């Protein structure tokens, strides 16, 4: 076995395909609720995130679309309203409507993605290991079992040792972020000040 590879090619970066993209497509294709109706999928990619995402269409038929089907029709469009937005606009919108950012941003992460994302840099991995040491150790053990490393140029233990965990990580934030239940209000109450999280505008390893 091998880990998914940091590549635009979804055949080798299989985590994005099998665990995210194909899961949604499978539901749309197999659930009869989506037959003979019109469905709009809202997708949050921004062109600022990568060159490939900058080329995505803002509006197009979804990969699960079957609007010209013979037995039944499945009319599904995909809309990317944020494709041309800048990160500043996103934070401004969250502040305007008092939306609470995900706790990972308050810990210092610049992206809310998989905790040990294959695109992560040494500081991201060191921070993730700080939050979830047992999971990090399990990935390190997988490298030894597979005979292949997650990163092409280094092993995970060395990568983590080179990084510096974000100083804004706290036990409370780590507990909130890793809990199976989330009880904080999504909309911040009026008696609480909205705060820009430490991870805002932080450059991190991200999508290709």
Where do the PLM segments sit?
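Nucleotide-activated chemistry modules centered on ATP-dependent adenylation/adenylyltransferase
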Residues: 1-208
